[in-house]
């Protein structure tokens, strides 16, 4: 989800069949026993255990959780490099069956024309995981809101989903997920507002962020009656937005220098007013503890997923690979809860890891605000 930088409140998730999480911020079943690319991870499952087979990448640089603070300047580089590595491997075998259908409002003037290209880039990165068969993207301004409602209805979705990115006469946010009813297509609504055209986040990172939300929920396709709801019920909110934002920012820009710039602006450019301006380790730890799956979606601090959650996932990526969090979602879809899946993926309990992450993320945010 994405949206306007001016608004620090989260857009309430709609009560329709696409119960995804969104924020009005700018800047905004994986198949067991499936062998994927040599440099990615896979899951092997029997009747009693679930085992994560680690990434095989002899030339990659990773850090252990205990090395995070000593490598505060290397963590973003290691994580960003791994996104590029996996993407470069995946495009050798591009998924040619996935279909993207774009619908653009009749009076909507797009300031960015590569929408499909960046949605596809997100899909290419995640192509070793369970995917929906199709992704529908609806792009519209407020004038075209009624059009969007009708288009969603005629495409088999619920028209009211079109309202999610809109507020106070402006459509500026974004919202994506997996539709409740079979065949569980991915669907995203993208508000278009000309004043957003100055925002670099809107030129690719947003699209990858949004399609990542759909891929997360797709891990429950074929497993749960309502994959999106099951994903929401399984995931802490910091992780839900963290995985999407880390992918969007890392894959949506062309160079590491651009990544560092947008990383800094995303973390420092939002929720800097109380109560969202305290990034002490104790406050971050409290945020982790209150990010309870199935409940946290309504929390007023949901927006912290775009900073604290994002930086936490970036650290996880530097520890175990840029696709490691999606592997964790695959484990959750197989029946494990978040804490079980986290320990299987990162070889440390969440209870032991979270105070270390809190210290690290606090230091990163302090550095970004003071640089």
Predicted features along the sequence, with ranges:
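Beta/coil-rich, acidic/histidine-enriched accessory regions frequently appended to metallopeptidases
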Residues: 53, 117, 334-371
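Surface-exposed patches in mature extracellular/periplasmic domains of secreted proteins
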Residues: 125-141, 222-227, 235, 255-262, ...
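Surface-exposed intrinsically disordered loops and tails
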Residues: 163-178, 190-194, 221-232, 276-300, ...
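Zinc-dependent metallopeptidase catalytic helix centered on the HExxH motif
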Residues: 167-272
């Amino acid at each position: 989800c994405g949206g306007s930088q001016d608004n620090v409140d989260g857009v309430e998730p709609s009560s329709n069949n696409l119960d995804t999480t969104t924020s009005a911020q700018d800047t905004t079943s994986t198949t067991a026993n499936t062998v994927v690319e040599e440099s990615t991870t896979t899951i092997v499952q029997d009747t009693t255990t679930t085992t994560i087979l680690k990434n095989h990448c002899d030339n990659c640089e990773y850090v252990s959780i205990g090395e995070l603070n000593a490598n505060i300047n290397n963590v973003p580089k290691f994580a960003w490099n791994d996104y590029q590595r996996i993407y470069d491997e995946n495009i050798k075998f591009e998924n040619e069956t996935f279909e993207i259908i774009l619908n653009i409002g009749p009076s909507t003037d797009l300031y960015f024309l590569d929408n499909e290209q960046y949605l596809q880039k997100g899909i290419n990165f995640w192509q070793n995981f369970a995917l929906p068969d199709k992704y529908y993207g609806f792009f519209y301004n407020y004038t075209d809101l009624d059009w969007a409602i009708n288009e969603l209805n005629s495409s088999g979705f619920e028209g009211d989903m079109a309202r999610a990115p809109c507020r106070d006469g402006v459509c500026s946010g974004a919202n994506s997920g997996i539709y409740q009813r079979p065949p569980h297509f991915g669907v995203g609504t993208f508000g278009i507002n000309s004043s957003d055209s100055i925002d670099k986040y809107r030129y690719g990172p947003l699209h990858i962020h949004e399609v990542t939300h759909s891929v997360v929920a797709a891990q429950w396709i074929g497993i749960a009656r309502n994959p999106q709801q099951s994903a929401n019920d399984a995931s802490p909110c910091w992780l839900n937005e963290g995985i999407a934002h880390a992918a969007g920012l890392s894959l949506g820009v062309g160079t590491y220098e651009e990544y560092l710039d947008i990383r800094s602006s995303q973390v420092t450019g939002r929720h800097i007013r109380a109560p969202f301006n305290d990034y002490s380790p104790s406050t971050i730890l409290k945020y982790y503890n209150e990010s309870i799956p199935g409940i946290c979606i309504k929390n007023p601090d949901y927006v912290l997923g775009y900073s604290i959650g994002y930086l936490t996932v970036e650290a996880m990526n530097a520890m175990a690979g840029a696709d490691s969090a999606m592997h964790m979602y695959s484990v959750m879809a197989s029946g494990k809860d978040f804490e079980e899946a986290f320990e299987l993926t990162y070889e440390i309990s969440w209870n032991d890891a979270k105070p270390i992450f809190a210290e690290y993320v606090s230091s990163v945010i302090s550095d970004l605000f003071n640089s």
